[in-house]
Amino acid sequence: SSSGDAFSGGWADYADVATTGSPIAVTAVPTALTNDGLGVDTNTKYLPISGNGITQLWNTSSNGFDFSDLNVGDMLDIRMDISVIIASTNTVVDVNLLMGTGGSVVVPFISDQNYKATGTFEVIRYMGIYIGSTDVRDTLAQLKIEADKNCTCIVHGFYIKAIRRG
């Protein structure tokens, strides 16, 4: 017997080059994590294109996740790979995925992470989300970083797996 739901999907990995040479300045004001998609590890050949109509999941021009080719009910797994460069002890960092109009849906990737020492810290977070409305689907989603003390951030890349329902 067959189940009522069928799933298909694919993935892409967008690697950044620009922030390696010019890290993102992080302050108390939420700042978008940028990714030019020009890194040697960028790989979009496994996007679920054939018959599924998904052409991209990351928009390098707007620096945001583009879910417009997905349907309400589709699912995504996102892996964020960054390094934060902490210049002052006891720096607290947050990274949130803001989705929907005005960032009305907030998915925390890093919440109140206190870096007690200075230095460079690699941070990898993996989060599963779903497209719960047309607003979430049709509005560019962004990862935004902020900190209570000035620091910098290098984006290594974003891996995104799309799972289509139906």
What are these language model-derived features?
Residues 1-166:
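Extracellular jelly-roll beta-sandwich "head" domains, especially the C-terminal globular C1q domain
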